[in-house]
Amino acid sequence: MEQIPQEQKTEPFLASFTTTEKLGTETPTTSITPNTQFRGRYEKPNCAVCNEVGDGLHFGAEACRACTAFFRRSVALSKKYECRAGRNCEVSSNIRCMCRSCRYDKCIEVGMNPECVQNRRENDTPKADLQFDTSKTEIRRPIPNFNIVPQASAVPSTSNFMDFSIFKDTPISNFSAFSPASLPGLSSSPSLETMPLLERMRINYDKMENARNVIHRREGENIFQQKVPRAITFREATEVTTKEVSLVADWIEWCFDDFGLLPVDQKTILFQNFFVFFCMLERAFMTVKSGRDGIVVMASKDYIDYDNLEGFFKECNSGTGGTPAEIAKLIRPSFELQKRSLINLMRLENVDSYEFFALCVMLFWDFGLEGQSDECNEVGRRVKHRVTREMTFYLRNVKKHEEPLYRMASVVSILPSLQRAVRRFQEDIEMANIFNIYALPENFVNIINGKFN
């Protein structure tokens, strides 16, 4: 019988629970105050399955060691259980012979993810081999071949880090903006076991970045060399946005198993509502990471120069009702709103990659959209609850925030600013299209207004 890998210990995350912090005094670190004892108990909730003393977040839910081992063994060995009492047995640690079928169902109900067990087993390989076979750590299907670029077969096998050093005058870390090791204050990197959804989004985002490196490559540009960003025109910006539709749609499907189970009409409703918000949120996030002011970074890693909007609209005066200078004057307030209410706020809050992914989850799984089914609403609620649990774990145990709830509230407060910026942008595009102020491709207008398939 194949040996089941043992549970990875979580002592690094829990070490701080047994010591006190220095709050301006020389209190010995070995003393334990009542407040510290309370905080330690609070930060280790009981097992969500059997209510036994918890051992932290495992496979996406708070669980004790026994339930964690039971769930791993059940999934790894593909166990099939049968309940003899109508699948309504009590699951509690004080029951000597607990119904295994109901116990497993309870594990799934509280959010434990079977895929994390399988991927954990796949990752049980010697460290020396990991650098040569990174595909075993991935949890999505391979990136499809994109026919837009003939040379798409030569996709680099290593992760395409987001390197913003070319925007800066001073050297920066070689770490990716999306690498856990690059985040300030991290005591340990998150894992697929402790944060399955957010970590899966990060892994798949890196793969989408590799695909972008191919799709948005300029003629004569080598995909294996570091891209040199440049200011782009309005026409080029619309092309980038149009190409992003299929890439982002694939990323969403790679990240959420629940999405793949929905009917096509529900998938369309969710994605049409999400795409333009995601584009603007991601641009703001990448702009903040670039460290430069007066620009907005696109998915292609090129940028729009706020200080030269006439150059941005230089190709828009053919057969339209305005010159580049007039168009720039008309559109500038919209760009200023993006900078003032969204980019500056994200810079102030210093949003990191996992917080960015959590915002993406909140945006995508919206509630009460026109035509959205009750089933789709319920699926979205469950996914958002899962990511909330993971963010609580991340902020408390990894980033060491004393008040993770306040931090989460600060991050979520970005969403109203994003909504204002998107609505203003949509209004400007609609006005330009109606009055023919500048030439707009029909498919781009439909994308911005969420009317595409």
Curated annotation (Swiss-Prot):
Gene Ontology cellular component annotations, sorted alphabetically: nucleus
Keywords: DNA-binding, Metal-binding, Nucleus, Receptor, Transcription, Transcription regulation, Zinc, Zinc-finger
Annotated region described as Disordered, given as residue ranges: 1-37
NR LBD domain: residues covered: 178-451
Keyword Zinc: yes
CDD domains: NR_DBD_HNF4A
Biased composition (Low complexity): 18-36
Compartments (UniProt record): Nucleus
GO BP annotations listed: regulation of transcription by RNA polymerase II
Portion annotated as DNA-binding: 44-119
SUPFAM superfamilies in the cross-refs: Glucocorticoid receptor-like (DNA-binding domain), Nuclear receptor ligand-binding domain
Matches recorded under SMART domains: HOLI, ZnF_C4
Pfam family for this entry, one: zf-C4
Main localization category: nucleus
InterPro entries found in the cross-reference section: HNF4-like_DBD (IPR049636), NHR-like_dom_sf (IPR035500), Nucl_hrmn_rcpt_lig-bd (IPR000536), Znf_hrmn_rcpt (IPR001628), Znf_NHR/GATA (IPR013088)
Zinc finger (NR C4-type): 47-67, 83-107
Domain of life from the UniProt record: Eukaryota
GO molecular function: DNA-binding transcription factor activity; RNA polymerase II cis-regulatory region sequence-specific DNA binding; zinc ion binding
Known function: Orphan nuclear receptor.
PANTHER family listed in its UniProt record: NUCLEAR HORMONE RECEPTOR FAMILY MEMBER NHR-86-RELATED, NUCLEAR HORMONE RECEPTOR FAMILY-RELATED
Annotated family: Belongs to the nuclear hormone receptor family.
Listed name of the protein: Nuclear hormone receptor family member nhr-12
Phylogenetic classification of the source organism: Eukaryota, Metazoa, Ecdysozoa, Nematoda, Chromadorea
